[in-house]
């Protein structure tokens, strides 16, 4: 069984540092921001950034297909105001181009929020339009939609939202999904027992389909079940408990995709990675 576990590591000081940070915690996969995620604008990646990134990647033996870049949290492709949506779209395109430059084939993003100004469907249509515009203007990068906890006016908390965006897509070969365990749980999808896990994963397969699953975020949840609150926790310390992660590590449908920790204490990521691998039966 081939599981590729890692964490969302820092790219502080340059993207080329991310592979080294992943290697330091014993990761076989990783996520990163390819630019400062708190700013709209960022200076372009230099030739040196790109060359060193590739060099460091080779040294640490992590394959590009096991890297899941994440876009900036500022981006809202479903923004109700056209000017702000346009700003988000331009920033999103820039993120996709950065992935292209680094030879990375995925970009993970949160779908968007209606800010209580438009309906959920209108918001989903805006997100779908932005995705299609991005697909038209780029190549080689799969847009990976993350499920959300449904906090505030964030969409993506139902599997049906993810399916809707896939259905509206002009190129389904370049769209995928990332499942975040904490978000699933907070949105009302239980994974705490084998029975609950199987039921949730069956629903995911029927509504979205495992062929679209391009990665997972492995998090426990501080927030209660179905609370629609997005609060991550260290594995086994939250409301989900360790069994769910044991089910994940032994589920062959989750082979060969990046399984990324975004748990709250980065000083124990190496231990959490070890723990997850120890679950493999």
Curated annotation (Swiss-Prot):
Cofactor(s) needed by this chain: Zn(2+)
Q: What does this protein do?
A: Endonuclease IV plays a role in DNA repair. It cleaves phosphodiester bonds at apurinic or apyrimidinic (AP) sites, generating a 3'-hydroxyl group and a 5'-terminal sugar phosphate.
- Cofactor comment: Binds 3 Zn(2+) ions.
GO biological process annotations for this chain's record? base-excision repair
Q: What is the lineage of its organism?
A: Bacteria, Pseudomonadati, Campylobacterota, Epsilonproteobacteria, Nautiliales
**InterPro entries tied to this protein:** AP_endonuc_2, AP_endonuc_F2_Zn_BS, Xyl_isomerase-like_sf, Xyl_isomerase-like_TIM-brl
- Entry protein name: Probable endonuclease 4
**Family under the similarity heading:** Belongs to the AP endonuclease 2 family.
Write one Pfam family the protein is assigned to: AP_endonuc_2
Molecular function terms in GO for this entry?
deoxyribonuclease IV (phage-T4-induced) activity; DNA binding; DNA-(apurinic or apyrimidinic site) endonuclease activity; phosphoric diester hydrolase activity; zinc ion binding
The record lists Zn(2+) 2 as bound by 146, 180, 217, 262
Sites where the protein binds Zn(2+) 3: 183, 230, 232
**What pairs make up the disulfide bonds?**
none
Question: Known EC number(s)?
Answer: 3.1.21.2
Instruction: Write out the catalysed reaction.
Output: Endonucleolytic cleavage to 5'-phosphooligonucleotide end-products
Write out the entry's keywords from A to Z. Answer: DNA damage, DNA repair, Endonuclease, Hydrolase, Metal-binding, Nuclease, Zinc
Task: Name the residues that bind Zn(2+) 1.
Answer: 70, 110, 146
State the NCBIfam families in the record. nfo, PRK01060.1-4
